């Protein structure tokens, strides 16, 4: 039997710019503040898929830079509200589910937002939350804002 890993205080938060993910980020920041933890805030991006003929992509199009700006805009008010919390924004290319699961190694908690629609699991917690809850290497909290 192996001994459990010592807590790191690291809370991984998956955000996509949606109101639900921003509420989850705020919740995670409060939790980090209460526990002396830190936040790793992750936003992913992908090239849009195409079928058949694809429209030309402008040479100056930089989806990673767009995502980075969105992430910075999400993190800024949270950092202002919780200045004592270390927040590391991260951008990664790819689907969010496997990236969040991989990054959950060594984290104490993974927090994602809920879509909050319907009664079925996939509709209540969303596909990313459902995937992470099943595969993450740490506990997962799917945050659903009060309505």
Indicate where each model-derived feature is located:
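Generic structural signal for helix capping and beta-alpha/helix-loop junctions
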Residues: 48-49, 99, 121
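Glycine-rich, Arg-bearing micro-motifs that act as flexible, cationic patches
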Residues: 109-134, 145
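Structural loop-to-beta junction motif characteristic of Rossmann-like glycosyltransferase folds
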Residues: 137-139
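Short, hinge-like loop/turn segments at secondary-structure boundaries
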Residues: 56-60, 106-108
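A short acidic, glycine-rich active-site loop
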Residues: 58-70
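Small/aliphatic-rich secondary-structure junction motif
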Residues: 2-57, 135
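Structural beta-alpha unit
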Residues: 1-7, 20, 34, 77-110, ...
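General small-molecule cofactor/ligand-binding pocket signal
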Residues: 40-42, 88-92, 141-143
């Amino acid at each position: 039997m192996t001994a459990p890993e010592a807590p790191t205080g690291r809370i991984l938060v998956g955000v996509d710019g949606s109101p639900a993910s921003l509420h989850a980020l705020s919740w995670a920041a409060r939790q980090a503040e209460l526990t002396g933890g830190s936040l790793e805030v992750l936003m992913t991006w992908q090239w849009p898929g195409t079928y058949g003929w694809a429209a030309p992509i402008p040479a100056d199009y930089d989806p990673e830079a767009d995502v980075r700006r969105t992430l910075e805009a999400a993190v800024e008010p949270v950092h202002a509200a919780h200045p004592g919390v270390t927040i590391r924004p991260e951008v990664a290319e790819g689907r969010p589910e496997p990236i969040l699961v991989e990054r959950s190694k060594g984290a104490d908690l993974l927090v994602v937002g809920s879509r909050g629609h319907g009664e079925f699991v996939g509709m209540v917690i969303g596909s990313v939350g459902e995937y992470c809850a099943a595969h993450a290497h740490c506990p997962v909290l799917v945050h659903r804002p009060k309505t």
